[in-house]
């Protein structure tokens, strides 16, 4: 439930201010995507209601004059001109199901002209994007606080009607501004060599790997100007993909697509474990089949059941726990479907370290070398939206858990509270959570592979009928030696070294080519 007594404050963080996204980072419900909000044709209309997604609430969509209209509200929004000079936003996109069709949810393109969309209240603005895959909704001027319910009207490229079904999804993002920054700390394993990324390096590219890694441990091919070094502005997901977020995605796929993204047939019995099959609740993944599908015609319906009692989507069923067991193809397909894309290693370091920030040798994402262990074996309110570690202090990070089926990742953003600083919350310079520990991030990069063709093309919202991403020039297999390195460490990282911001010790490891208990991820998008 929403906390109606939230307060807002700014937190001093070295040379910057990070807005304390109080209840966004508090002990509260943390669903990452809006639950399926469906408006049905008049002769099919059953019932619908507004549903909570993290602190973002999107009301039931309705069709008004060929446009799609719904309400949006969220807590603790910010837009600050002070360092780091960024803001939060909600990435909103729409899926459409033709009434009486094949149950396929297709991506619905939106107008590419911002003026064709609107939002009431005078506080927010709608930013269209050039490919029409979605829109960003954000504050239009400097300020902070809760966003009251506002009516959003989206103009679809194909007019909405009263017989089709619509789902509106929203995910919290953080704007990462244009600016210089440093890659590498000169100390961590296989680190980049301390190069400063500037407008000039972005425009010129890198002739070879020795230009950014002293031992040449990078791309076989020269990195051209089109390769995203991180200098230019982009948006980054505030949190790692959550288990409920992944469930909502699976529930929007066809039966055939579900086969590709799970380990067992969607027609398997109720209670089957589709993401991992070794044992129930393996490494705290609580995704199960709630309603079996029918081969080739009707997809399964998945749900969360972390406490393994057979009742789905209860308060303690781990909906807000970071989703693990995501292979490179799993994450890439999810990002393509969402209209996002993978980040590069260099962008990862930009998000974590910040722009114009002095280098700290062996630093973690929160900007210093202090680290405090948190594990899923010592929790309060385990599995709930209020899940927190019993440990508290500076540099708290989910790492060091035993390699067993009972330990796993924690709730997304578990370390942040109403009055935590960046160091206490384990937050990045820009306010992005859990970039060290919890689950490995998956980034374009690594070693012994030519990933120079990656040009940062965003996903288009559409995946193949076989259930695979198909955006041009994305590395296909993943793995440190196939263009998709794992960064940031995980709940199972034994030594804190691989949790360091600039550590690249997984550059030769291809373990994320298949589902692993320690791997998850998040996406980014160019504006």
What are these regions (language model features)?
Residues 1-33:
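N-terminal secretory signal peptides that target proteins for export/translocation
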Residues 36-48:
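Bacterial N-terminal signal peptides
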Residues 49-53:
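Sec/Tat signal peptide C-region and signal peptidase I cleavage site
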Residues 71-84:
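Short amphipathic, basic-aromatic surface patches that mediate peripheral association
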Residues 82-92:
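Short coil-to-beta strand junction motifs in C2/discoidin
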Residues 103-141:
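Solvent-exposed serine/threonine-rich low-complexity stretches and specific carbohydrate-binding patches
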Residues 321-322, 413-428, 458-527:
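Disulfide-stabilized, aromatic/cysteine-rich ligand-recognition loop
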């Amino acid at each position: 439930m929403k906390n109606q007594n939230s307060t807002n404050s700014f937190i001093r963080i070295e040379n910057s201010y990070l807005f304390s996204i109080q209840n966004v980072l508090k002990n509260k419900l943390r669903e990452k995507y809006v639950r399926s909000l469906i408006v049905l044709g008049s002769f099919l209309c059953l019932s619908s209601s507004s549903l909570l997604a993290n602190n973002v609430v999107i009301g039931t969509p309705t069709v008004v004059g060929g446009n799609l209209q719904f309400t949006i509200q969220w807590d603790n929004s910010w837009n600050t001109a002070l360092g780091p000079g960024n803001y939060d936003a909600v990435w909103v996109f729409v899926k459409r199901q033709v009434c009486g069709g094949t149950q396929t949810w297709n991506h619905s393109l939106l107008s590419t002209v911002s003026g064709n969309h609107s939002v009431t209240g005078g506080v927010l603005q709608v930013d269209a994007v050039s490919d029409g895959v979605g829109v960003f909704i954000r504050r239009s001027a400097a300020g902070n606080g809760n966003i009251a319910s506002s009516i959003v009207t989206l103009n679809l490229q194909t007019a909405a009607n009263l017989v089709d079904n619509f789902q509106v999804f929203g995910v919290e993002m953080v704007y990462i501004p244009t600016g210089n920054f440093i890659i590498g700390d000169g100390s961590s394993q296989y680190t980049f060599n301390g190069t400063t990324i500037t407008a000039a390096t972005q425009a010129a590219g890198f002739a070879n790997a020795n230009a950014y890694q002293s031992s040449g441990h990078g791309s076989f091919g020269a990195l051209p100007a089109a390769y995203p070094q991180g200098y230019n502005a982009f948006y980054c997901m505030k949190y790692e993909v959550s288990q409920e977020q992944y469930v909502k995605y699976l529930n929007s796929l066809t039966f055939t697509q579900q086969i590709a993204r799970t380990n067992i047939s969607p027609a398997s019995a109720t209670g089957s474990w589709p993401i991992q099959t070794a044992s129930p609740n393996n490494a705290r993944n609580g995704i199960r089949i709630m309603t079996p599908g029918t081969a080739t015609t009707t997809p399964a319906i998945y749900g969360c059941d972390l406490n393994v009692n057979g009742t789905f989507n209860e308060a303690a069923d781990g909906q807000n726990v970071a989703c693990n067991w995501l292979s490179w193809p799993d994450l890439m397909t999810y990002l393509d479907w969402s209209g996002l894309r993978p980040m590069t290693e260099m962008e990862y370091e930009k998000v974590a370290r910040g722009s114009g920030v002095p280098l700290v040798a062996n630093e973690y994402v929160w900007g210093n070398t202090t680290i405090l262990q948190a594990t899923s074996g010592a929790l309060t309110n385990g599995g709930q939206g209020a899940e927190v570690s019993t440990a508290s202090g500076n540099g708290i990070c989910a790492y060091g858990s035993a390699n067993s089926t009972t330990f796993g990742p924690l709730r997304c953003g578990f370390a942040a509270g109403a009055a935590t600083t960046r160091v206490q919350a384990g937050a990045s310079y820009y306010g992005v959570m859990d970039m060290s520990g919890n689950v490995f991030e998956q980034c374009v990069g690594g070693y012994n592979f030519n990933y120079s063709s990656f040009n940062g093309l965003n996903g288009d919202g559409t995946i193949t009928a076989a259930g695979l991403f198909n955006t041009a020039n994305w590395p296909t297999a993943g793995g440190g030696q196939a263009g998709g390195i794992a960064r940031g460490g995980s709940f199972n990282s034994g030594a804190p070294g691989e949790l360091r911001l600039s550590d690249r010790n997984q550059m030769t490891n291809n373990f994320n080519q298949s589902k692993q208990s320690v791997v998850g991820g998040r996406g980014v998008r160019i504006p």
